[in-house]
């Protein structure tokens, strides 16, 4: 089955149709062994011969990619950004030390963050921010700032990303809700884990893939996402709930795979943090909001969007 790579644009309708086709495939049983094989294959199959980058946050998803590429003796460097003292920088440096990876990092100052946000806002489509969607746009802007800044640190044209793993292996807070109290998350009615995970995959093109493609295209670079692979999706989505999540842990089987591959526990056992939090970019935006005289981040965002018109 071919890997879905985000350098090729796909319409929202065609993306949803493709995911629904995968959803209708039956009689597939995912195991730790065949998921490991599928993940390795997805990463190794199209490894570039020229030097490439890996966006290493220090989380389990990107650390698995780095470990497999290291085992293949592939020509790559890792990249991580954040505010001074951020968790992503701290953990990624430790992972790089243990695995002997070449890691390029940058600590950003507050004034640099505002300039990054302005760059990102110019790249992304102009939003209509309302009270019920500004958090979604805030996430889009802050994560895009992390992506743009990390990819700017190197002249590599191809960067590997761990996006997709959260949906496949139940890494988000709404997945926790789906096996506990249900309810809503950012205005979305939470369903059972299986249904919620498929719905999350259907939303990925609009919320994540198209965002990352806009950023990478603006730099004339390409993002490769090995977790967004047909065979891997089918196998992972066939897993029962208890293989993915319980009251103590999420992404359970992926963490087990990471340990088997030799990924350090600093990554394999690390709890999920969004890029905006692990990098502390979200904290920086909070500080910038106050410095610029606003009480709400939404108002600060509005002021930055207004500058886009100038």
Residue ranges and their predicted role:
Residues 182-183, 265-310:
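PAPS-dependent sulfotransferase catalytic core
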Residues 15-29, 300-304:
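Extended hydrophobic/Leu-rich segments
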């Amino acid at each position: 089955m071919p890997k879905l790579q985000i350098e090729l644009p796909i319409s929202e309708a065609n993306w949803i149709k493709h995911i629904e086709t995968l959803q209708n495939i039956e009689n597939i049983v995912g195991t730790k062994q065949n998921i490991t094989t599928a993940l390795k294959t997805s990463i190794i199959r199209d490894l570039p011969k020229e030097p490439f980058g890996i966006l290493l946050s220090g989380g389990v998803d990107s650390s698995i990619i780095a470990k497999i590429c290291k085992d293949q003796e592939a020509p790559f460097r890792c990249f991580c950004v954040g505010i001074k003292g951020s968790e992503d920088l701290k953990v990624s440096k430790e992972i790089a030390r243990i695995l002997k990876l070449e890691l390029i990092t940058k600590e950003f100052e507050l004034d640099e963050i505002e300039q990054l946000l302005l760059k990102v806002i110019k790249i992304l489509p102009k939003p209509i921010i309302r009270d019920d969607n500004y958090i979604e746009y805030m996430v889009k802007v802050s994560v895009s700032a992390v992506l743009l800044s990390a990819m700017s640190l190197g002249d590599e044209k191809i960067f590997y990303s761990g996006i997709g793993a959260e949906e496949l292996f139940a890494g988000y807070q709404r997945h926790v809700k789906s096996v506990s109290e249900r309810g809503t998350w950012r205005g979305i009615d939470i369903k059972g884990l299986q249904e919620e995970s498929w719905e999350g995959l259907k939303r990925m093109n609009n919320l994540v893939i198209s965002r990352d493609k806009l950023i990478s295209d603006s730099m004339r670079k390409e993002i490769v996402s090995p977790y967004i692979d047909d065979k891997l999706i089918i196998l992972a989505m066939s897993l029962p709930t208890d293989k993915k999540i319980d009251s103590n842990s999420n992404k359970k089987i992926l963490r087990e795979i990471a340990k088997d591959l030799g990924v350090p526990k600093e990554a394999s056992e690390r709890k999920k943090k969004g890029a905006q939090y692990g990098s502390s970019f979200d904290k920086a935006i909070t500080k910038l909001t106050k410095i610029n005289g606003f009480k709400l981040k939404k108002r600060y965002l509005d002021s930055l969007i207004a500058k886009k018109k100038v």
